[in-house]
């Protein structure tokens, strides 16, 4: 993982006194930083587990599950996941301080929350989690819990107001996911909740990209898990309140999954969002669930069974990390796991097209096959038509590149790169087949 290559940066010479590009492009330091941050998050998770559970053995087991769970491989192996690691580290420390007895004035907790906000905008969701912790888990009254978490709420409101004044990020202005209303949105939300629960409890079908979920057929198993989770929570709230004390197993169960649901609210991704569902969103919210599982195993399961579970998760996490070492195995596994994930086909096409170790004909054939896989999942993806035309143009086939480039231009007429490739294809075709070029023009 430390010497993986999943890192891209434009090799332009930076101004002094920054290091030269050949130093910037060495990924070992970046990956090692992520590994160390993950280790720090595990230590902070152990401290938080001791405060929440009151049992060091259960907290240790929960922290170990958090450390080796394969759903966190994306956050650690992908350098871009550093934002989630930093935010989770500060939030775990703030959460642990919040579990301490009330003090007249606490400066460090708001500062830790501010550091998390500056690391990742989705940290604003910590405010309702903090309120739930004081009101439910710590047993404070409603007013006392609100008074204790008021500085966090004020920081969250000020940060959101400032962030909204800047406008949406440029990367999100186009191509963002826009949810439908009514029953389709409800089913999609239930499927997302069920998918997250399935990924935590059965991490055997992980993938790097879930874009395309909104257009794929509904997964009835995930929808059923989402419905079951909501039904159980509602039943417990309405009929079984006496079992919801923090010291009871049922109370810990509901508290853990309530915190998970809060962290997965749309506000945690600051709509409009680029990805409706992603494993990296689980890094912070998975901890209370894994702590609850650790507490249950510490009391009910033999020690050998708990150690075996940790070992199995560690093996799965190691295998998942190996996929993140390079793009072709990563996107290849994604295409095999989720045929509807059209962007995985696009990324696999890019990976094959840039693989200089293969002969040109083999490289072109594999790239086109990957693009066709993505187009079967989403024929309206202009990026796939663009990439297919680009691959054909690189292969010296401007005539074959014209149809996919025309299709890409019709789907995204404002894309300057597609226009450039279309003009380039026509120019190359004019030097070889003037009649065909005039007809195309």
Where are these regions (language model features)?
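Polytopic membrane enzymes that build or remodel cell-surface glycoconjugates and lipids
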Residues: 1-359, 363-394, 417
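Alpha-helical linker/edge segments of TPR/alpha-solenoid repeat scaffolds
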Residues: 357-358, 426-437
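Single-residue signature of alpha-solenoid repeat helices
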Residues: 367, 401, 437-440
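Tandem repeat domain/solenoid detector
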Residues: 397, 406-410
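TPR/TPR-like (Sel1-like) alpha-helical repeat modules
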Residues: 409-410, 423, 427, 440-441
